[in-house]
């Protein structure tokens, strides 16, 4: 036998060339599986070397063709590896871009909120700490006050209108009244013609409120012109005016009483007509609404021949009252009987109509059956 028949098959197996590209886990696994298959085939061929031996083709050619390393398997796996690598790179790039955009957006929003908060922060000024800045308080008192003056100067040719005058707070006055600010006293030229006794008396009479309690009486007394007008008013004239108003009111009262009160001198016929027309007389106004039975009683009295005596206005006697009560009771009984009779008669008429309708229906049905 030839020497090569006893040579192991793995000596003739060509070694694959070394590759520089990295393989994925799946590709390595496939290669490991392929190598295990090759080893199984080699072991089988060791024991059965005569199966793959063909002398016509020169030795171990069939076995060599069967176990030749084929690069087609690797070339077929390359597109899947390239596709997976490209997807992995694309997803990683997309995640990086999204994270960058998100971080930029968060930083921009944070900067915006910080700027808004910085603008909203209260800026403390000197007026918030007046006890630390006394010069600011002094400058604040000197402001431009608007005062209304009317009428204007006599020398001005422009039409009379409200003018505006600028001054200090110490000279502030409106419509003849002066207002004191704190405990500051006004100049003495405004109060040259007023005595302190008069000021005190006026302040006691006027009962000035708590707003002026801290101020001396010289600061809130009216000007000379208004003071003179108030002193010129005589309290006696005010009392006379009040008396005239009261007298006018008392004079108009009798006319109102005549229109509102009940006139006992009117005739009884007029009284009955007003009662029938629905007007309520003041004599019965306390009872509320006038009942219909009262109107019937007046009618009954007139039918009995009773009339009111205009001179004596004498009431009814006992006999007349008994007769009136008996007649009224009889009328009430007759009214109730009449009402019951009418109700029964109406019900009887309705019953008769229903019976007649039933009879007519039965007769019409009988005639139709006969036909």
From Swiss-Prot:
One GO location term (cellular component): nucleus
Main location: nucleus
InterPro entries for the chain: Vasculin_fam (IPR028128)
Top-rank lineage group of the source organism: Eukaryota
Keywords: Activator, DNA-binding, Nucleus, Transcription, Transcription regulation
GO BP: any one term: DNA-templated transcription
Coiled coil, from the record: none
Subcellular location: Nucleus
UniProt entry tagged with the keyword Isomerase: no
This protein's record includes keyword Ribonucleoprotein: no
Protein purpose: Functions as a GC-rich promoter-specific transactivating transcription factor.
Family of the protein in this entry: Belongs to the vasculin family.
Protein name (Swiss-Prot/TrEMBL): Vasculin
Lineage: Eukaryota, Metazoa, Chordata, Craniata, Vertebrata
